[in-house]
Every structure is written in C-alpha cells, then in structure tokens.
C-alpha cells in the first residue's frame, strides 16, 4: 500500500475542495449576511491541511493497487465530510455543536438530506447556499464513483450491471479512460442542473431558491432552503418539475450518456432497471392515490398530486416533501418508507439497495420456488435474454446479507442510546438508504437525537453511499496484510 501516494491524492482533493468555499463567500458578500469570515477561515484551514499532505509527497509516483482504491474511496468521503463541517461550526449562525455540524455535512455530501437544523428559513443565505452546494458536489462525486471508479474495484451496482446485464452498455465502457468518463458525466450532470434551475425559475421560484433546489434535486439530496421544503411554494408546476428531474436523476447516468451520444431515448425503455423503476413507481402512485382518496380528506386531484410527488420523492430517496407522509392513514407511511430500500438505478445519484439488486433477488427467489416444483430442472436467472452467472447471484446475496447484518447492528446501537424502536428503525433505514426523512421522533428533524446515535447514523450514511463493501473491506485483516 502506497501511503505517500494516498496522502498526495487526499491532499490534492482537499485543496480542490477548499475552492468550493469561494461561492458561499461571494453569496455572503452579495447578501451582506456577515458569514464570509467563517468561510475564509474554513478555506484557509482546508487548503493548508491539503498542502501539508500534498507538498511533501508531490513527487510520489507509484501504481495504485485495488486495495489503495478502496481506502481512497472511503477516505475521500470521510475527510471531505469532516472538513465540510468547518463552516457550519465556525459561523455560529445555526448554533451547531461539532457533532451536529459533522452530521449535517455528511448528510449533505452523501445526499442523505437528514437535518439537525430547525428554523432553516431564518438562516443566512451563505449557509443556505452551502448546504445545497454540499449535496450537489456529493451527487457529482457519487456519479463518478458509481460509474467510473467502483466498477474498477469490482464492487457496486454498476460492476454487476456493466459486466453481465444486457442493454446498451453491454461489453463497453462509456469512454476508454476514467478521466474522460468523469468529464462526460460531469457535463451531463451540469446540464441537468442548469436545465432544472431554469425550469424552477420559469415556474415561479426566485433565482436563489431555483439554484439551491436544482442542486439538491439533481443530486437526489432533499435539502431545501425552507423548513416546509417544496411544500413552501404550494405550486403544482414546481412539484411536477421536481418529480420529473428526480426521476431522470434516478436513472443511470450511463443511460443519459448513451441517450446524449446517440440522440435517442429508446434506451430508457430497453433497460431492465429503468423499466422496473418506472413500473414500480407507477404501481406505488396508484396504491397511494387510491388509499388517500378512500381514507383521507384530500380531493381526488389533490390526493393524486400529493401521491405522485411523495412517491417519487421518497422512492428515489430524495426526501423532499409537500405533506407530512408520516401522518397519512393506514400502512402508507410504512409502504413509502420501505420503497426507499429499493432506491434508484445503479450509476444514479439515488440511494437504497439499487434496483438491479432487487431485480436479481426477486428472480433468484422465483428460481428457488421453481426448483421446489422441478427439483431436477436447470433454471437460469435471466435479465432480458442473458443468463446471470452464479457468481453474480452470490455477490448480490452477499451484499444483502451484509446490509441486513449492518442494519441490525446499527439499529441495536441507536436503540441502546435511548431512542425508541420506531425512531431507531426509521432513522437507520433513512440514513443507510440515504433517504433523509424518518418516522417517529425524527419525522421533523434529527436534532433531538443523542450525540452517539448521530455518530452511528453518520456511519450509516457513509456505508450506504459507498455501497457497504467499500467500507467493510477496510476492517478485514486480509486487507492490511502485505
């Protein structure tokens, strides 16, 4: 393992990350909210630390191995999450403790969207902008990580997807080099962001809200510049725009690349993941709208409007809200919350276990049922017309087993801090799936949870964002052997 190379890369990343504190400084000066000094100090600390890591090792040249990639991926999010909390601690405007500042920073960068802050409408504009920017940067990093980096390490949904699943991406990479792939993905990501912001402005948002919400929409993050989230605007047009861009961002960015390159949209309907996600959301919308129509005071159109928005927002793991879904009748809150466990497509900014894994788990389950009926039959698991090798099936079940085990351990850990069962279950689920909104005592915000519970949930956010194995492998003795 090349420690000097890792320090060189992390130092460079920190210095680059420090530049992201320049826009909040400009926003602070524009709105004269007095927050610019804190961002200047945070910038200085970040760039100084990065320089101390980079400069002594700037001439280090050594080929990185797979295990170095795992460590860099985990440290990338951990280090940026810690340094990203500096402005939130230094401003004092949100009155955040170090624990709360770290929680908010990790929630932003992992695009979870869980918040410990109350009175968001009263925050200075620089802080509001910074929270939204954290999610946008996190979303951009996730796309590159999921599509360009994790597959080279052999983990992540796209590693399964690109090697074994039929469709427009079969047997091909987006571009020959990771650098070129990253540039292509960033171009698409930025284009979607600008388009989303312009659409929000056309629907009635001011430029500041439109920019901030476009950041968290394309990133499927869920942070808002208002306590009431998207519901603050009370606009069907804004809700429709938000739902549309959440759905687009929940599709694999590899599909967007192919659609952009070939100038046609048929790939979305040929792709097994995209088709499953569209059918899954349509089914949930029908169930939710009918349930609201039968059991609540919503008028038919209002119930449909809220059903469409909340289903898309929760199921894609964004967590925006126009209504408090936790108060909806019957099993609807539980149903919507569980939908987030499915999440977005592999290679998207969405969280959850990823659609491709759910498809494979369902198909393997059906295969075992058929084997009970026909014990001697050789039954292949197929996606489209292509058989999925048993190694892929084992990888999916391995991920699912690790997911369930870690969920249970963190659930017990959060409950041990004194949190009730419903709140503990939902907060672990919301953070591990990078959803944000929870049920129980954390349905409004996470601020009242014990500090130890918040640190456990920070770990859950990181595990969910890095698709578990990227972090878990670091704690195996074999990883550290020479």
From Swiss-Prot:
GO cellular component: plasma membrane
GO MF, one annotated term: potassium:chloride symporter activity
Keyword ATP-binding: no
Membrane topology: Multi-pass membrane protein
Keywords annotated in UniProt: Cell inner membrane, Cell membrane, Ion transport, Membrane, Potassium, Potassium transport, Transmembrane, Transmembrane helix, Transport
Highest taxon of the lineage: Bacteria
Keyword Oxidoreductase: no
Localization of this protein: Cell inner membrane
Ranges annotated as spanning the membrane: 9-29, 35-55, 70-90, 136-156, 185-205, 240-260, 276-296, 325-345, 395-415, 455-475
Membership in a protein family: Belongs to the TrkH potassium transport family.
Role of this protein: Low-affinity potassium transport system. Probably interacts with Trk system potassium uptake protein TrkA.
Protein name: Trk system potassium uptake protein TrkH
Native source species: Halomonas elongata (strain ATCC 33173 / DSM 2581 / NBRC 15536 / NCIMB 2198 / 1H9)
The gene coding this protein: trkH
């Amino acid at each position: 393992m090349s420690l000097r190379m890792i320090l060189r890369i992390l130092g460079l990343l920190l210095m680059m990350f420090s530049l992201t504190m320049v826009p909040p400084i400009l926003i602070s000066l524009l709105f004269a909210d007095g927050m610019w000094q804190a961002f200047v100090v945070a910038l200085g600390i970040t760039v100084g630390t990065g320089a101390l890591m980079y400069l002594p090792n700037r001439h280090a040249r050594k080929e990185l191995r797979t295990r170095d990639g795992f460590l860099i991926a985990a440290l990338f999010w951990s280090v940026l999450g810690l340094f990203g909390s500096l402005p939130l601690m230094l401003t004092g405007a949100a009155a955040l403790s170090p624990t709360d500042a770290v929680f908010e920073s990790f929630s932003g960068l992992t695009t979870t969207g869980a918040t410990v802050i109350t009175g968001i409408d009263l925050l200075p504009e620089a802080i509001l902008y910074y929270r939204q920017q954290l999610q946008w940067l996190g979303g951009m990093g996730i796309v590159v990580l999921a599509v360009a980096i994790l597959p080279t390490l052999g983990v992540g949904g796209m590693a399964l997807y690109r090697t074994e699943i039929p469709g427009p991406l079969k047997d091909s990479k987006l571009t020959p080099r990771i650098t070129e792939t990253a540039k292509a993905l960033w171009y698409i990501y930025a284009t979607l962001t600008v388009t989303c912001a312009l659409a929000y402005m056309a629907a009635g948002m001011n430029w500041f809200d439109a920019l901030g919400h476009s950041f968290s929409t394309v990133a499927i993050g869920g942070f808002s510049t208002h306590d009431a989230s998207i519901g603050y605007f009370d606009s069907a047009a804004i809700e429709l725009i938000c739902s549309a861009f959440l759905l687009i961002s929940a599709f694999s960015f590899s599909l967007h690349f192919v659609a952009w390159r070939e100038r046609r949209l048929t790939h979305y309907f040929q792709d097994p993941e995209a088709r499953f996600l569209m059918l899954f959301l349509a089914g949930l919308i029908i169930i939710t709208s009918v349930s609201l129509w039968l059991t609540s005071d919503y008028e038919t159109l209002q119930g449909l409007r809220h059903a469409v928005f909340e289903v898309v927002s929760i199921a894609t793991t964004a967590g925006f809200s126009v209504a408090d879904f936790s108060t909806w009748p019957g099993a609807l809150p539980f149903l919507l919350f569980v939908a987030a466990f499915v999440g977005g497509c592999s290679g998207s900014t969405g969280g959850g276990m990823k659609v491709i894994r759910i498809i494979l788990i369902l198909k393997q389950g059906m295969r075992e049922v058929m084997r009970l009926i026909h014990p001697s039959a050789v039954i292949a698991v197929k996606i489209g017309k292509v058989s999925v090798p048993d190694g892929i099936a084992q990888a999916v079940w391995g991920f699912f087993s690790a997911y369930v085990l870690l969920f249970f351990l963190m659930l017990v850990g959060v409950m041990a801090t004194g949190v009730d069962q419903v709140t503990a279950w939902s907060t672990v689920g919301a953070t591990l799936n990078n959803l944000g909104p929870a049920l129980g005592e954390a349905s409004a915000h996470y601020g009242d949870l014990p500090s130890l519970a918040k640190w456990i949930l920070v770990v859950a956010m990181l595990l969910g964002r890095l698709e578990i194995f990227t972090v878990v492998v670091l704690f195996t003795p074999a990883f550290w052997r020479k």
